[in-house]
Amino acid sequence: MILALNIGNSNITFGGYTTDGKLVFSSRLFADTALSSDELLYKIVNMLALYGAEPQQITAVIFSSVVPALTPRLREALRKMCECQIMEVGPGLKSGVR
């Protein structure tokens, strides 16, 4: 499963996709800038469980953020959650898309 997340000013939206691009689930969390990486991890893992998904099923993660205060905390939470490839959308990302 590929996990895609977007940190916006109000919400963190995310979804799980099969490797052929089919949406498995989508959800959102309030984007609270006071959350620690562990609190973000807890919330994400519990949302995955709500939809019957487990961190071990995640093979890759891609995320974007417009909230600099949350970006490093989310990155750390994702690294704790899975040992998969984590891509951050931003300048210099080599995505293969032109």
Model-derived segments and spans:
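Residue-level preference for the first positions of well-ordered beta-strands
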Residues: M1-I2, A60
